[in-house]
Amino acid sequence: MSGVNNTSANDLSTTESNSNSAVGAPSVKTEHGDSKDSLNLDATEAPIDLPQKPLSAYTTVAILCLMIAFGGFIFGWDTGTISGFVNLSDFIRRFGQKKTTRGLTTYRK
């Protein structure tokens, strides 16, 4: 640990940084005056208020969102119901294939 200096906070002093560092570089201003000072906005300018819409204006959007959400719910419900129905022993006994190792029929291939 010979490279580490154990100095207290009181012993630290400021030193001059490298002249090539980005911190010491002068600010760059163009001839058009692009600087932070040119971004001053008038404090007297009033903010623009958005028009307030009644809740009835959002009724159609709310109904459409509910219908879309309900459609996703029904899709999941339907898929779960059909999957459970196909696995019932009575359904397999009546409509199942006797040779299940064959896979799909030749009509579907």
From Swiss-Prot:
Residues 1-40 are annotated as: Disordered. Residues 29-39 have a biased composition (Basic and acidic residues). Glycans are attached at N87. It comes from Saccharomyces cerevisiae (strain ATCC 204508 / S288c). This is Putative transporter-like protein YIL171W. One of its GO terms (cellular component) is plasma membrane. Probable glucose transporter. Pfam families: Sugar_tr (PF00083). Residues 1-22 have a biased composition (Polar residues).
